[in-house]
Structure formats: C-alpha cells, structure tokens
UniProtKB/Swiss-Prot annotation:
Record family assignment: Belongs to the bombinin family.
Protein name (database record): Maximins 5/H4 type 1
Tissue specificity comment: Expressed by the skin glands.
Gene Ontology biological process terms, A to Z: defense response to bacterium; defense response to fungus; killing of cells of another organism
Record-listed Leucine amide modification sites: 144
UniProtKB keywords: Amidation, Amphibian defense peptide, Antibiotic, Antimicrobial, Cleavage on pair of basic residues, Cytolysis, Fungicide, Hemolysis, Secreted, Signal
Signal peptide limits: 1-18
Organism encoding this protein: Bombina maxima
Amino acid sequence: MNFKYIVAVSFLIASAYARSVQNDEQSLSQRDVLEEESLREIRSIGAKILGGVKTFFKGALKELASTYLQRKRTAEEQHEVMKRLEAVMRDLDSLDHPEEASEREIRGFNQEEIANLFTKKEKRILGPVISKIGGVLGGLLKNLG
C-alpha cells in the first residue's frame, strides 16, 4: 500500500514538472515573439528617421551647392564641388545598404580621394551642423528608449 502511494505521488510530481517545463517553453516563445515584434517596430522607426534625415541632408546639400556655385567660381572649382556633392549623395544613399557601399568604396575610391572629399573650409561649416544633428538624433533616440 505504501509503495502505491509513493508511485502515485512520484507520477503526479513528474507530470506537474513536465507541465511547468512546457509552460515555461511556451512563455519563452511568446516573449521571443514579442521581443522580435518590438525590434521590428524599432527598426521601422529608425528607418523612417533615417529616411527623413537623408532627405533633409540631400536638400540641404543641393541648396548649399547651388548657393556655392552661384558665386563667381572657376569651372574647375565648380567641377570639384559637384564631385564632392555626388560623393556625399552616394554616401547618403549607401546608408540603406552598407555592405554594397563598402564594396563600392573599395572598388571606386583610393585612400587619397576619400581623405580629400572635403576641404578645410567645408569641414568647418559641416562639422558643427553634423554634430548638432547627431545630438538631436541622440536625444530623440534616448527619449524613445
């Protein structure tokens, strides 16, 4: 009689443990699904912000280039500015596909061309603007998180 109770209690404990393990697995899979959904939402928000920033930068760069080119410049200076603007536009477009961009950079540029994309004057102008935008985006991301 005593043996029957021990077997019955052991069976109940084993079945309860099996149910708890199964419930744990289900809750973990549900958590994984929720985490994946939240990551997708974060990525979509980031993509929208990045798209807006890219659009802003493209417009600002075009305006800056047109203003810069309207001044009296030599044809060589204008050509150099347009080359730089095209390089920046390619960089902005490559933000969507960083793997392809790195391959293009390796094929299309040498190190000297990359180093000489901007002159000192342009760096003085664009540096503070980019740092301000970075600060604003950092603040937005901090508020979202």
